[in-house]
Amino acid sequence: MAKGLFHLTHGIIPACDVLTLREFERILEETSSVECVVAYKIGSVLALRFSLPEICRIAKKHTDLPLIYDHQKAGTDIPAIAEKFAESCEKSGISAAIIFPLAGPSTEIAFIDALLRHKITPIVGCVMTHARFLTSEGGFIASHAPYEVFEKAIERGVQHFVLPANKSFEPLAAFISKRCINPSFIFVGIGSQGGSLAHAFSSVGRHNAYAIIGREIYEKDIRLAAREFCTQALKFK
């Protein structure tokens, strides 16, 4: 049994990055009773089309599990937006929010602090799963930036971190583990993007580990796919 945001130390988080309410409800109906589903990730597409409060209302007809909002990518605006963002999440019924604070330390601090004030668990990431993101990959974002982002997040009390399972995440996981007393790692990029749940979970040892999984669940037999991923996750319980 885990303490805090999730009720288990290892589990999966279905990503509800779909276009219709029927698709969304089907994910909930098919997975809410699967043993190690620990939360649901709600993306910006559903929120924009139907409103975040409405999405949360529908979700809560099917589940009591935490709802994680992924604004794709929150934390890239000016610091003044943070309070409005956090208040909107709280009033909608969100439990946690993912931010990628690429706009600098002032924005990162503002978003983390605002979320905590509104009793929303901040989940911080900095490396996306696609190619040519960091400068070392031919992208725009400095390769040392994730270390600075995560260090600042830990200083502000963050304990939940997003890492890309389909990239070389191990140095970042080790960096976080040395500085955060009880980190929870949330992996993305598993399945068609090349990441392995088993490798990701085993790489962080005794620490809590979770996998956000979207298309590999909702584009297949939803219940069966969720159960298969849960079988993998429960091996690390």
Range-by-range predicted roles:
Residues 9, 76-169, 181-185:
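Conserved anion-binding
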Residues 92-104, 190-197, 206-224:
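Glycine-rich phosphate-binding active-site loops on the catalytic face of alpha/beta enzymes
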Residues 10-16, 38-42, 67-71, 97-99, ...:
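Hydrophobic faces of well-ordered beta-strands that scaffold small-molecule active sites
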Residues 27, 82-88, 173-177, 192-207:
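Catalytic cores of alpha/beta
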Residues 1-68, 76, 152, 219, ...:
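Conserved N-terminal beta1-alpha1 strand-loop-helix module at the mouth
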Residues 18-22, 45-49, 73-78, 104-105, ...:
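Short, small-residue-enriched loops and turns at beta-alpha junctions
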Residues 48, 52-71, 113-127, 174-192:
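Alpha-helix-loop-beta-strand connector modules within alpha/beta enzyme cores
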Residues 32-33, 89-90, 154, 201-204:
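Non-catalytic positions within long, well-ordered alpha-helices that form the structural scaffold/packing
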